[in-house]
């Protein structure tokens, strides 16, 4: 009863991605091997090495770019391609696919393929709330294609450049966000267990303060034990009112909500469960294959 559906645009005004922070912050740490010229994601290079050389106190996701470079050099982590340990410094690689609209290829005509479905929900928040007459709390959900220019796609359909994503943006009162975060965290866990994913192959990992995204108050990742190691299936995040506030700032459009019962205005907080459909399908294929073998 709380939620409604949406099918938002894949190509949106490029200022949407400026407001959301994707143009400046949606980056992966790219590092090159000087010997064989192979390119790697620095964090994945370290994680691959740690899988064979466990160091429980090391949290890769909390590392800065400088810390990752220092760790790679201190541990003499080898290049998977040539075995040598001679890497460049890290440089930022933006994950958004860029294209051009119209007949001229100048910067004024640049647009992006959406890297997530969430922003299409945020920019339509007021339109949806008014037309559906929904009262807070309520959610807007959609399933659709997202696109990311991954540095190192691989592991079959786990990391690909075009993928199917399911996201729910659940809007709530600011003081109730952590309660709803716990609710959706529990809901997602039960949903995955309903697919017969066994607890020994499924874990919940709460982000430490140092690794939280800049917009997040709390985040939990649901990770599955794939043959290549633990990988994220689903993330649940408390995005606070960051996104709506940013779009209000950049667009000049009012994004607040008037609570008639309390006679007050506020910008809603958002709880976001974000699921990669392809990854869940891969996990299901793997554990059903294991069951058949047994």
Task: Tell where the protein language model's regions lie, with residue ranges.
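Cys/His-rich finger/ribbon microdomains and the adjacent scaffold used
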Residues: 1-275
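Conformational gate/switch positions in structured elements
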Residues: 277-279
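Short active-site loop/helix that positions an aromatic residue
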Residues: 282-286
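Conserved small/polar residues in nucleotide/adenosyl-binding loops
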Residues: 287-294
């Amino acid at each position: 009863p709380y939620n409604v559906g949406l099918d938002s645009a894949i190509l949106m005004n490029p200022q949407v991605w400026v407001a959301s922070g994707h143009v400046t912050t949606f980056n992966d740490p790219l590092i090159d091997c000087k010997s064989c010229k192979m390119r790697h994601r620095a964090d994945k290079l370290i994680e691959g090495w740690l899988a064979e050389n466990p160091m429980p106190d090391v949290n890769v996701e909390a590392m800065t770019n400088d810390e990752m470079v220092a760790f790679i050099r201190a541990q003499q982590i080898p290049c998977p391609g040539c075995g040598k340990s001679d890497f460049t410094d890290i440089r930022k690689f933006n994950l958004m696919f860029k294209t051009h609209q119209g007949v001229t290829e100048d910067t004024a005509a640049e647009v992006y393929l959406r890297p997530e479905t969430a922003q299409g929900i945020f920019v339509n928040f007021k339109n949806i709330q008014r037309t559906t007459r929904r009262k807070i709390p309520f959610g807007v959900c959609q399933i659709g294609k997202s696109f990311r220019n991954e540095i190192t796609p691989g592991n079959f359909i786990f990391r690909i450049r075009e993928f199917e994503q399911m996201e729910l943006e659940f809007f709530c009162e600011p003081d109730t966000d952590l309660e709803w975060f716990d609710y959706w965290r529990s809901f997602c866990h039960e949903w995955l267990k309903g697919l017969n994913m066994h607890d020994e192959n499924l874990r919940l990992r709460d982000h430490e303060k140092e690794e939280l995204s800049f917009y997040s108050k709390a985040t939990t990742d649901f990770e599955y034990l794939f043959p290549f190691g633990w990988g994220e299936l689903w993330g649940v995040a408390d995005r606070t009112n960051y996104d709506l506030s940013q779009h209000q700032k950049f667009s000049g459009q009012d994004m607040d909500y008037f609570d008639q019962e309390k006679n007050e205005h506020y910008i809603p907080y958002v709880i976001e469960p974000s699921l990669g459909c392809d990854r869940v399908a891969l996990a299901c294929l793997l554990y059903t294959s294991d069951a058949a073998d047994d």
